[in-house]
Amino acid sequence: MTATAQQLEYLKNSIKSIQDYPKPGILFRDVTSLLEDPKAYALSIELLVERYKNAGITKVVGTEARGFLFGAPVALEMGVGFVPVRKPRKLPRETIAESYELEYGTDQLEIHVDAIKPGDKVLVVDDLLATGGTIEATVKLIRRLGGEVTDAAFIINLFDLGGEQRLEKQGITSYSLVPFPGH
């Protein structure tokens, strides 16, 4: 099933916009309101699965924390493993880490060293693409373990914040269901 304009509009309307959150001047796109609507949540998973089910994906990686909410059901429906990428010291087995820049400083993500095997074809899933820093760090982790990443899928793309272009420079095609301006 290819997404229809009506389906995509339904998804867009299920996402609430919160003015001045988390600080004045920010218009926050709240994907948790989509999760509250079982029809919208199921549709978002269905559309992502439909797009990637014949792409030879062997693992789906989701970034903490909302990436888990979309990545795990996509992996389950596709019959492939799900791999969480988490903040430091949240994974119990041996990990590798990658730092990335935030607006005011740096942060770090980790992945289990045995979660991705050389040659795995990996789809990265997250709730939202903004500047692309989190996904870029996630892709670096996967590639360090020998995985191949060509695509990243999102529910929301804040299209004017440069995330798509940043990922393109890394050879990653981004796909999103709902575009919103970031400013």
Swiss-Prot record:
Annotated metabolic or biological route of this protein: Purine metabolism; AMP biosynthesis via salvage pathway; AMP from adenine: step 1/1
Record bears the keyword Transferase: yes
GO molecular function: adenine phosphoribosyltransferase activity
E.C. code: 2.4.2.7
Keywords of this entry: Cytoplasm, Glycosyltransferase, Purine salvage, Transferase
SUPFAM superfamilies, alphabetized: PRTase-like
Catalytic activities: AMP + diphosphate = 5-phospho-alpha-D-ribose 1-diphosphate + adenine
Listed NCBIfam families: apt (TIGR01090), PRK02304.1-1 (NF002632), PRK02304.1-2 (NF002633), PRK02304.1-3 (NF002634), PRK02304.1-5 (NF002636)
Family as reported in the entry's similarity comment: Belongs to the purine/pyrimidine phosphoribosyltransferase family.
Identification of the protein by name: Adenine phosphoribosyltransferase
Encoding gene, per UniProt annotation: apt
